Amino acid sequence: MNILDKVDAASLRDDIPEFRSGDTVDVHVKVIEGQKSRIQVFRGVVIRRQGSGVRETFTVRKVSFGIGVERTFPVHTPNIDHIEVLTRGDVRRAKLYYLRNLRGKAAKIKERR
């Protein structure tokens, strides 16, 4: 194990729940505005999980006021307070980019039992 692996292992978080593409999650993000800090919740469907180790990221998509919003988060960043898994999605793909072209009920994901 070289020095870079030790640094990476020290910065990994262990409080991340199991989630994958298709799951609906609440990401509680720390937002700093001036001197004040607050928690902002970003709720949406995980459309991608990519990478491994400290460089792992995931992308969450939601529709806000009729406009699709996607946000990519590093999994092990200290800016995420915690991640809450609301529902487990039943999908057959690892990357759900096709959801970008679907509207309304067609963009719904079945819940896994």
Swiss-Prot record:
It comes from the Bacteria. It holds the Pfam family Ribosomal_L19. One of its GO terms (molecular function) is structural constituent of ribosome. GO terms for biological process: translation. InterPro entries: Ribosomal_bL19 (IPR001857), Ribosomal_bL19_CS (IPR018257), Ribosomal_bL19_sf (IPR038657), Translation_prot_SH3-like_sf (IPR008991). Coiled coil: none annotated. One of its GO terms (cellular component) is cytosolic large ribosomal subunit. PROSITE patterns: RIBOSOMAL_L19. The keyword Ribonucleoprotein applies. Keywords: Ribonucleoprotein, Ribosomal protein. The keyword Ion transport does not apply. PANTHER family: LARGE RIBOSOMAL SUBUNIT PROTEIN BL19M (PTHR15680:SF9), RIBOSOMAL PROTEIN L19 (PTHR15680). Belongs to the bacterial ribosomal protein bL19 family. This protein is located at the 30S-50S ribosomal subunit interface and may play a role in the structure and function of the aminoacyl-tRNA binding site. This is Large ribosomal subunit protein bL19. It comes from Corynebacterium kroppenstedtii (strain DSM 44385 / JCM 11950 / CIP 105744 / CCUG 35717). The gene is rplS.
